[in-house]
């Protein structure tokens, strides 16, 4: 057998290809000659130092495909190529699918919400857009038109009202005939005038109350009852038999603490 030191001679580089021994060497024994004859072609594997040091790599051979698999691949290739070719060529297939799904979703949403289309009790009332108009107070249809009094009639009515606020039937008939008015017109005018006078009187009383309110502090009350002898003496003066002089209360005493016990007397 050949020694392992001769491996470099047996293998050739990638460019030379596989090396084959030419013939039987002049070996001493017949066994070595027969072994060398039976040697087969050795594949070129870069196991030498020079091959390992260099960056050259052997070309990778494509694996052999069995004939059965090759025939099956040839049959399947025409079936797969049209689909892949269309997909690689930017086919509108993936673009059409979102529209189809969107249309299906919209149809499903319409089918899933029938209460929106059906005018049932859950449907919102339709809104009628109308121009914004100022809504005025509607008067009664059978309301009589307002009487346009003249200046002389108004002056005569005011003078009569100051003399007498309530007129009898005879006085009202005579007064209405003198002013060329009906009794109903005079009657209604006096009613409205009395209501106006009442409102004015209430407003005057309210003004007087507001004017007199700051004079006394809030929550202030007299430290003694109204029906006490001291209060009666101050009211009636010397005519009261048990008259006692009333001492004047200083202004500071109004806000002092001893007066506070009568705060809730009149409340």
Swiss-Prot record:
One of its GO terms (biological process) is mesenchymal cell apoptotic process. PROSITE patterns: HOMEOBOX_1, HOMEOBOX_2. InterPro entries: HD, HD_metazoa, Homeobox_CS, Homeodomain-like_sf, Msh_Homeobox_Regulators. GO terms for cellular component: cytosol; nuclear speck; nucleoplasm; transcription regulator complex. It is found in: Nucleus. Disulfide bonds: none annotated. Expressed in mesenchymal tissue in the developing spinal cord and limbs. It comes from the Eukaryota. Acts as a transcriptional regulator in bone development. Represses the ALPL promoter activity and antagonizes the stimulatory effect of DLX5 on ALPL expression during osteoblast differentiation. Probable morphogenetic role. May play a role in limb-pattern formation. In osteoblasts, suppresses transcription driven by the osteocalcin FGF response element (OCFRE). Binds to the homeodomain-response element of the ALPL promoter. PANTHER family: HOMEOBOX PROTEIN MSX (PTHR24338), HOMEOBOX PROTEIN MSX-2 (PTHR24338:SF10). Interacts with MINT. Interacts with XRCC6 (Ku70) and XRCC5 (Ku80). This is Homeobox protein MSX-2. It comes from Mus musculus. The gene is Msx2.
